[in-house]
Amino acid sequence: MEQSREAYWLRYPSTSPLKLRWRALTVRHCFHVLPGESILELGAGSGLWTEHLTGVLRGENPITAAVFNEDLMSAATRKKLPNTRFVRVTDLAADLPAASFDYVVGTVILCHDRYAENLAALYRLLKPGGQLLFFEANYWNPQVLLKNIIRPFGRWTGDARCHVGMRKFKLMKIASHQGFTHIEVIPYDILHPLTPRALVPFVQSTAFILEHAPLVRELCGTLYIWLQKPGDRETRRPSISLATRRELFGSTSFVVPCHNEEMNIARLVEALVGFYGEYIHEIIIVNDNSTDRTAEVTRDIAAREPRVKLIDRQPPNGVGLALRDGYAAATGRYILTMDCDFVHILPEFRDLFEVVAEGRDGAIGSRFSHESVLINYPFFKIVCNRAFHLLVKLLLLPGVRDVSNNLKLYRADILKNLRIEEPHFAANAETGLKPLLAGYDIKEVPISWINRTVEMGSSSFKIAGVAPRYFLALLRMIWGAWRGHRGFSQQVSGTKTAGRAVDAFAREALDKSDQPKSPAAIWRKDTLS
């Protein structure tokens, strides 16, 4: 099986590197891997995927790459990968120590008659709270189905033969019987290996929709199988600071609008201080007329952590109004705006800080980048988001992928001088689009998105109610831009503060370095009315 998998990757040079990188990124985003956490890769072969894992994880994690085939082992050992050890394994139970790994990953490992036995061996290898992520052939993919039914077809395609149909519910039952919890079996990877190189970007752009569309998703070539061993994962994770850029120490105001978030605030603040304590100038919790104990919980936290500040808003409520008040109160050099339920993806924030440390004006956490990962994202929300951004691309900014997410790290003056007109969720589109239209140098950074779990409470975002406001906000911005000028980007040399591309209608707003900061410095009323 290991040799067949190796031959498969080498057979499709136009798509295999992309698929291998996607899988490495999925490991990183699903687990939110912290530096120092240990990874076991099963069936590493010559190390083709190991190279991508090492690169995506920055060489910060000890990787044990288990090779089954002796010939491939000699090829693997010639690779000099940082923090990686190749080992020959013939017996999972005997050759690897128990409870040694935070994560176990692999491709086409369970797809044979002994996968129940192997699940038991893998359970033994994981630490309490450890997780497993495997990529297996999707039995209901037409090519895989034909390959199993018509053996000559399987030999002609050259794929590794799947000895047992990976029936989703059967697998979930066996995994549960072995003791695993949080079992996810999800169709994955709509990109066919024979896709012409010229069509790959198009397939990438539509993959988010196709991989989440009912029925269509069942045609994906792969399943990702995500399991967890019971145990308190959070307490065993390393206590490590991700704040490595000294120039950003004490620089950032974290602005968090909250509505009925008493279940999440304490965990969020604790995690922010643990991961990014050196960056924190202040954490501003904007209580947007909550009916639970959000304000009380925040006051209790602020009594112990002086950098936590509470803004207790009065009606009317709305995300846009909460953001406006939070930005006005912020005193840091940078403002990071986020939702309270982003606690699981905090390790990914380091990529945003890297962007501003490089000298850019800001960064946006993009859920729909080619390297993003979505987990249990509602299909209708994907369709609405993609329709909105298609209009943005056609009518305003061709290059954007996801500017409406409320995860943004900007220079503080950009947000303080930004005029937010939408009182509710559509303000997130304004905070993404208006600075870009004004010419600021802002980069989209791939992140993951995980749907709320039961312990995180319910979201107040209701797509049917907020979608029309997003499109109205877009129409308002299009009208303002078209009234201001007909061409969107002109190169203006020597305008570092404003970014590279500066629109004619925005120049007045950008020429403000020596002026007092005013809420109307960008997108003045006469531009939009």
What residue ranges belong to the model's regions?
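Conserved class I S-adenosyl-L-methionine
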Residues: 1-32
